[in-house]
Amino acid sequence: SFYLDEEEDKEKILEGVKEALEELKQFTDIGPASVTGSQTEDKDWMNNWKEYFHQFYVDDILIVPSWEQPREERPYTMLLHMDPGTAFGTGMHETTQLCIRKLKKYVKPGMSLLDVGTGSGILGLVGCKLGIDHVLGTDLDPCAVSAVRENMQANHVPEGQFELIIGNIITDSQVQKQAGREQYDLVTANILADVLVPLSPVAVRYLKPGGLYITSGILDQ
């Protein structure tokens, strides 16, 4: 599905979509390939998702949207304020929660963490709260910069404790150089499963001897 603004040439765009579907039908069975349209009310779609993001627990960690006040439904040992903005990472996805639980299990004060695909910075922030001395996050999306910065401020994490690099750690030699090999006690990667295949042999290069690689894949389906 997709949205079109009123100013766009809807007839031309829809005609192009129909032509593309007809071409695709020559190679595979995609069903009737019909195109339907409807009008929708004008909303702030960039922020509409906030209606569905409310506080939740990951074991004894309470994660609260930054625009809400926490409600103690049960005791917690960590409070995390989060606003992912347009970056990935509310913490609600099961794979993110699996990584959070592994961080709780393995983090010791004074450790260092490399978080590949940091998004909103949620895994790095959990690490900071658990006693990680230094987090380096990497991400392809420039939106991660403002998201991480705002979430650091909301959780009183000093700038020197969590740094961020925008770029591809798999292919970008400059990002690889900035990260530095064998520098981290932990590497986390909670990203699309098909990215983990080329990433994993690269990610382990940044671990200290005996370090731990925590990963959880998200299917792009």
PLM features: residue spans?
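Hydrophobic residues in well-ordered beta-strands that form the structural core
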Residues: 64-65, 137, 215
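S-adenosylmethionine
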Residues: 140-221
